[in-house]
Amino acid sequence: MTNYFDSPFKGKLLSEQVKNPNIKVGRYSYYSGYYHGHSFDDCARYLFPDRDDVDKLIIGSFCSIGSGASFIMAGNQGHRYDWASSFPFFYMQEEPAFSSALDAFQKAGNTVIGNDVWIGSEAMVMPGIKIGHGAVIGSRSLVTKDVEPYAIVGGNPAKKIKKRFTDEEISLLLEMEWWNWSLEKIKAAMPMLCSSNIVGLHKYWLEFAV
């Protein structure tokens, strides 16, 4: 099998590799998949590309996604754990005994990844999950619940380890929405974006926001 990636040290922009129309991506988000060899489309499991009535995978800008991360789509995939049997009889109706089975499929809603999110290698995000801006998902975490902005989570199931910043600093970051700035403004702010000076970054933003 030919590796889609040339090097483990350089990912590829999602905008350059995603072909599934049910995956929506922002600018500069990338997938670094060298160790698994496939493009990002294969990270979105069970997501039909030829249907528009399915849950979508929506990824913001400036997201970093590690090799082998996966996003489980297709709702409950035809399994109802609240029924007597979770078996998907409906999808095997060529068997006469199953011909009266009901369709158990249920949507979960769109899976939404915010901006500036870092998802570690082989993390798994379950259907319908919302991950807030600036969150960090630890490698091999199983994300079964929504993740708040700027939280660091890890484990199986994933639990909050800590917040990246103080509540005040998080509020400033969410107010600024730096990921929506023009490249010119990002260039000027780069020394602060590459630092922990959230207050200074906010002051810079106030100068051009007014």
From Swiss-Prot:
Name of the gene this protein is made from: catB4
Catalytic activity reported: chloramphenicol + acetyl-CoA = chloramphenicol 3-acetate + CoA
Organism whose genome encodes this protein: Klebsiella aerogenes (Enterobacter aerogenes)
Enzyme class: transferase
Protein name per UniProt: Chloramphenicol acetyltransferase
Keywords: Acyltransferase, Antibiotic resistance, Plasmid, Repeat, Transferase
UniProt GO BP: response to antibiotic
Taxonomic lineage: Bacteria, Pseudomonadati, Pseudomonadota, Gammaproteobacteria, Enterobacterales
Keyword Acyltransferase: yes
Alphabetized Gene3D superfamilies for the sequence: Hexapeptide repeat proteins
UniProt cross-references to SUPFAM superfamilies, sorted A to Z: Trimeric LpxA-like enzymes
